[in-house]
Amino acid sequence: ECFTIKKSKLRGVESNGMICAEDEIGIGTDHAGIIVLPETAVPGTLAKDYYNIKSDYVLEVDITPNRADACSHYGVARDLYAYLVQNGKPAALKKPSVEAFAVDNHDLDIRVTVENSEACPHYAGVTVKGVTVKESPEWLQNKLRIIGLRPINNVVDITNYIVHAFGQPLHCFDADKIKGGEVIVKTLPEGTPFTTLDGVERKLNGRDLMICNREEPMCIAGVFGGLDSGSTETTKDVFLESAYFHPTWVRKTARRHGLNTDASFRFERGVDPNATLYCLKLAALMVKELAGGTISSDIKDVCAAPARDFRV
């Protein structure tokens, strides 16, 4: 949250500034204290120039609950595009092409089973084998920092970029941790323990939809990932998930566990069911470009009821 640094006295000494750690000003993850610059740093240089932080425009948009379509950069752009066209103004609406998506081999096939199609009408996934998890390129890190997100690694950053760019939450699993080589979308017995990414062990409700492997749960569907199934610096193969989860199921689960995430915020308002495959293909292409590897399976696409485009 932004605040103004004001002149104050500390132990009788007037202070005109504040000591900030790297993580407090969005240039790194270290919280040790004073940032020590090398002697080559030129006094008077703007911090944004020294750290190569690109300037950009940031728009704050208040979204009413019925405008889930505007919960992304593309959604807002689409709204502006419609307004401009209606008023006779020249405008173009563009998004990245995914025509280059192609399966390189079938070396890592992970099966998908959806046991609860009411809670999950559409689930899709694909594997990318031989990735190198590392820092994202500067342009991607800047895109995330500008909107207040902390870069983590190239694979996770891609999923965060896509959810904010196009409104479709994605999840990335370490493929080696999908026991039995199968992803199963289902509910589990009341009281089943599950530890989420924040290290908290939660007791599941019988109506919490879960993403599981053959032996254990891996993720609370549409809400929060598990502590042990996500990608890390040692991950070599990933399984990318893109899905449409029913808004009511996500909303109730998020409330039960006191969770409010970027994913649940969008799913409980209703994401575009026609964006599922597009965003999955875009994520796979970006992973290939930024983390290497090969697309090593067909897209596993389980769709109970294909959605149709709305006509206005």
Regions found by a protein language model. Give the residues of each.
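RNA/tRNA-interacting regions in translation and RNA-turnover enzymes
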Residues: 1-312
